Curated annotation (Swiss-Prot):
Gene Ontology MF terms: methyltransferase activity
Name of the molecule in the record: Methyltransferase/ribosomally synthesized type I borosin cyclic peptide precursor sveMA
The family this protein is said to belong to: In the N-terminal section; belongs to the precorrin methyltransferase family.
Role, per record: Fusion protein of the methyltransferase sveM and a type I borosin core peptide; part of the gene cluster that mediates the biosynthesis of a type I borosin, a highly methylated cyclic peptide with potent biological activities. Type I borosins derive from the C-terminus of the fusion protein, and it is the same protein that methylates its own C-terminus using S-adenosyl methionine (SAM). The C-terminus is subsequently cleaved off and macrocyclized by a prolyloligopeptidase to give the final product.
GO biological process, one term: methylation
SUPFAM superfamilies the UniProt entry points to: Tetrapyrrole methylase
Enzyme Commission code(s) on record: 2.1.1.-
Precursor leader, as annotated region: 371-385
Amino acid sequence: MASSTHPKRGSLTIAGTGIATLAHMTLETVSHIKEADKVYYIVTDPVTQAFIEENAKGPTFDLSVYYDADKYRYTSYVQMAEVMLNAVREGCNVLGLFYGHPGIFVSPSHRALAIAREEGYEARMLPGVSAEDYMFADLGLDPALPGCVCYEATNFLIRNKPLNPATHNILWQVGAVGITAMDFENSKFSLLVDRLERDLGPNHKVVHYVGAVLPQSATIMETYTIAELRKPEVIKRISTTSSTFYIPPRDSEAIDYDMVARLGIPPEKYRKIPSYPPNQWAGPNYTSTPAYGPEEKAAVSQLANHVVPNSYKTLHASPAMKKVMIDLATDRSLYKKYEANRDAFVDAVKGLTELEKVALKMGTDGSVYKVMSATQADIELGKEPSIEELEEGRGRLLLVVITAAVVV
């Protein structure tokens, strides 16, 4: 069915609850829990389940009832999606909650969203903290340096996906290799070990990772050689879909100096991407840089004489503007009222400056950025952006913050 240009009554929002109990749940997701007509969920701990059930304004439904030990998981996924869709078709504003990020290794969420959009309903996904995010934090990894390759373990095997020995490699669901139902006995795990040994050798290190869920839980970070993965006592510890393998780089990649020249990077300014802190699990051919080399020491020595640039913009807004923007960001129902009639909403807010009112009535992020920040010089002079400058901000304002890149 072709998508409708006018969404029907009823909507579907899919959100993630994160991995660690409640700690990873976003304010946006909490707002949706409190406002949805019906909430469907799959979570991995009773505390998150209790929070959902106690904060939802409407009925809640545990989608895990559609799992069964001998039941094909894809059948369960289709049923989970259809149950949510049926509620949307009834005209309900439906929230589907999935642990972790709702779009990463989650089939029913994508299926339900696609069908809802195809049938003309409003549908969107809200992000959540994934197991990958959790692992990057716990292991101290940056996927940008030296790059990252991720595969689901079974798909990695059946499609003969390549590992990259010069990047981070992540294998998901290593505790359920070849499993299509809910019986995670992992009898095919040896096939995964065979493949890893073939590609990287028996002595390369692998980190078995499982992020902590409950406050009383402990994160698992166990390091083994690939050969040690064959030990029965190790195999017993890798037996659920929560188990993830981090496979560190073995080698350092060569630099394409021809491309460096084509990119126009001056040779005298170019140096290798810094690799600090060193990767404690990497192979012997993977190089790293010291914490305080010549360039780092020079950067530190400049701190004593650092002067804030004239172009730096600091937060500068009325208390009313700060409050209304925080409220709009954390209260979905309030934002809907704002969008329904911006002029009336803004006029009812006390304490806004006239320019802040104009920006809020425009309803664009660019205009809001412009009235909520200013250089120190403009603040001292009492200079504000003009209406014309706010109009120029009607388009989406792109903010780019580079924290990891080739150093030039």
